[in-house]
A protein has these predicted regions:
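Iron-sulfur (Fe-S) cluster-binding segments and ferredoxin-like electron-carrier domains
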Residues: 183-200, 206-240
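Cys/His-rich Zn2+-binding cysteine-cluster or related metal-binding knuckle/ribbon modules and their
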Residues: 133, 148, 152, 161-201
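ATP-dependent adenylation/nucleotidyltransferase module used to activate substrates
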Residues: 1-169, 208
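NTP-binding/hydrolysis catalytic cores, primarily Walker-type P-loop NTPases
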Residues: 243-244
Length: 244
């Protein structure tokens, strides 16, 4: 689901992006890197056909530990850093990479959170290892811009970016899905939205709850369609009531 949504969103942005009212060709690239076989070796509630059950609930609850993937961010960061070093080799220019962690993943002030590999301490240590272990590492900047804010701050920045690029935030965010337990619904007679089949979002998993809370805090309605596990559509008011 995430790959489908990411591909669709990149295609949409490449067709519709404007800056100060002028059409631009951003040439945003989306490349899929396969790690075939790795998922069979790891234990996590987020991995398909895994022995661990994905439990529902807020990140603040202990059951959210089922969403931990062993060493996830160092795996992703290592791959991206290797690509960045290769970009430096090919172009001779500096390269910048970013990790999308935030304080909802790990609070750097209180040193608490479900995901210690999202902490600034971990990111700094990993960057240090990358720099002492690679040539040309002085030409790669590796940072986590959202480690000083939570998911609400991330959403606010996304909305501000939509405004800057003259994008409809409802159109953009309806093309995203944050759910740990997405629901695929095929054709339903009489419902144009579901005519071709779409991915809907649950509203009970930790990632969905945090997203819903962020929209509520900003006084906005999430344009994403939420549903029960059986595919029954639920309203935004219903979702808000459940979360609050």
């Amino acid at each position: 689901m995430e790959l489908e949504r990411a591909t669709e969103l990149v295609e949409y942005l490449n067709k519709t992006l404007y800056i100060d009212g002028d059409r631009v060709i951003p040439n945003i690239k989306h490349q899929i890197i396969k790690l075939d076989g790795l998922s069979k070796l790891l234990v996590s509630g987020l991995i398909d056909n895994n022995s661990m059950e994905l439990k529902k609930g807020h990140y603040a609850h202990e059951n959210a530990l089922t969403t931990v993937v062993p060493n996830r961010n160092s795996i992703f960061a290592s791959i991206v850093y290797a690509v960045a070093l290769s970009v430096v080799k090919r172009t001779g220019e500096k390269c910048q990479i970013a990790l999308g962690t935030h304080m909802g993943d790990f609070d750097n002030k209180t040193q608490t959170g479900i995901y210690p590999d999202c902490s600034e301490e971990f990111r700094t240590a990993l960057e240090h290892a990358f720099k002492i272990g690679n040539w040309d590492s002085d030409k790669v900047d590796y940072y986590a811009p959202y480690n000083i804010t939570d998911k609400t701050g991330v959403l606010k920045d996304g909305i501000d970016s939509c405004e800057y690029f003259n994008l409809d935030f409802k159109e953009i965010y309806s093309r995203t899905n944050t759910s740990y337990a997405p629901i695929y619904v095929g054709f339903i007679d009489g419902n144009d939205m579901l005519e071709r089949g779409v991915w809907l979002s649950d509203y009970k998993s930790g990632s969905s709850v945090e997203r819903i809370e962020s929209f509520i805090k900003l006084g906005l309605e999430d344009p994403l369609q939420y549903a029960e596990e059986d595919g029954t559509l639920v309203s935004w008011d219903f979702v808000k009531k459940y979360v609050t």
